[in-house]
Amino acid sequence: MILTLALTASLVQQAAAAPPPAADYVPQRVFDTRSGAFIDFESMVAALAKAEVVLVGEQHDDPNTHRLEYALVSGLKRRRVAPTVSLEMFERDVQEVIDRYLSGAITAEQLLQEARPWPRYATDYSPLVELAKSEGWPVVAANLPRRFASEIAKTGESSIGQLSSADRTLVARDLQCPHDAYFDRFTSAMTDHSPSGDGKPAAPTDEQRATTDRYYWAQCSKDETMAESIARASEARAGRPGPVVHVNGAFHSDFGAGTAERTRRRLPGKRVTIVSILPVTDLDALAPAGDDLKRADFLVFTVK
């Protein structure tokens, strides 16, 4: 309890002390994969202002990435666009807490105590939430509660059917988890590729396959739930100009898969634009090619 209170106090102090990240220039280069050309950051923002959903794929815990996310959203504000901010980093069951904070009914300290923020919330996501609060924009707690994801990863998708009716509303109604290209990427990331005796990657055991399948179901459940949250937020805008800007780990939206594919399934005909932020060591040696051209509509390179 003492440790929890100390951590909360520390996060509150950090949130209060953190300067708006947009105040500093962030080295970056933007590549438009549709035109095959580098463009300036503001040209990208102008294009995003015309979208109905923008999915921003981030590398977690990268400071410049988070500054660019803030710059992107504040750029929409400069264009007199009032977006909805949607975050992977908050779970559906704390939506009421978020709403109470945005309305001024609770303090920042209470938000941190009740909303289970990520450890780097003060520096990485608080600026986005504070901007939304000051402008009166909605903030969507988009993700599946992590305790449900953990149970799915442990016991499989059957655990979803054992949820109470109230808890079931916190998980997407329509759940699809096909073994497609996204599954192949997920499996590649999950599987131990240590070589066998002949130097080739060792084939996964049945147990490893079963474990991967359970973890993939947890991943799909997150993607489906975030996509459903995004679709609901988009429909709630009732035709008002400007996008739902959803921030998630890049794996969830790169290559139009995961949350991106599931959002498009729910919003056919809507303009869904994907941004992928990529920290690199050298901005002067960029030559996007191959799979990177399929990764997103806009590639935003920044310095690690």
Protein language model features and the residues they cover:
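A substrate-binding/cap region within the structured catalytic cores of diverse enzymes
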Residues: 96-233
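Zymogen propeptides
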Residues: 36-37, 41-78
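Short internal beta-strands
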Residues: 84-91, 274-278
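N- or domain-start disorder-to-order transition segments that initiate the globular core
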Residues: 7-51
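Extracytoplasmic/secreted envelope proteins and their assembly/folding machinery
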Residues: 41, 45-48, 69-73, 125-129, ...
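C-terminal regions of proteins
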Residues: 225-245, 250-304
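Acidic/histidine-rich, surface-exposed loop or edge segments in extracytoplasmic proteins
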Residues: 25-29, 49-59, 107-113, 209-212
